[in-house]
């Protein structure tokens, strides 16, 4: 692959979405690392090994590993790169993770909402950074910002309550858009993320599973990531086809076999 020079000064990662069953990785003749676990993504920081211009990546895949035993349940034993492999660059000071909590209250209208943002600053750049969180439906429902001095790692949490939200359900899957932004001391946008958010309430009462206060009977199936033509390399089109087939047969729940599925499925 060819390195994009606009990525200079950023941390560069390579991500393997899924490799069965284990693999070693080298970049430009240098050993990067090893991973096993066919359905668990593996990510490596290659900042120190990547070079401007042409780079040579080598991957050695093993069909079986000492983790194969727990993966060998009711499945076809095929091996290789099953999911996407891609590079991405991230700023040195960045949002490392975030968690959204959206809980519909028992009245079915009001809700509690919080966002926890984890920050990463290994080189301890100084100055005041700003973090914005904006939740929007047909209109802006919530907007807040914090000014923080980032240490090596720290977190910021936004919390609020809403008197009225539009609930999410399988019949009316209404979603809000949450945007999280990190701005540096000079006012430059460093990083931003967008996440869909739905407000729902799931509970068990008197032996019944309730979603937003209404009893739901699960009619579920077990699903493997499998295509009769391409095997385990599932595309979005294959996922949509499976969902359409399930909806045609009134299926409303899916057990994703015994392993994590591709993120797109969720």
Which role does the model predict for each range below?
Residues 1-97, 122-123, 139, 253-266:
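Accessory beta-strand-rich segments of carbohydrate-active enzymes
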Residues 27, 110-148, 156-158, 178:
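Beta-strand-rich binding/interaction modules
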Residues 29, 85, 176, 213, ...:
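Conserved, mostly hydrophobic/aromatic
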Residues 40-44, 154-160:
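Short strand-edge motifs at loop-to-beta-strand transitions and within beta-strands
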Residues 58-60, 177-181:
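Extracellular recognition modules
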Residues 88, 147-149, 196-200:
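Short beta-strand edge segments in extracellular beta-sheet folds
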Residues 99, 179-249:
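N-terminal carbohydrate-binding accessory modules
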Residues 102-111:
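Short, solvent-exposed loop/linker segments at the N-terminal edge
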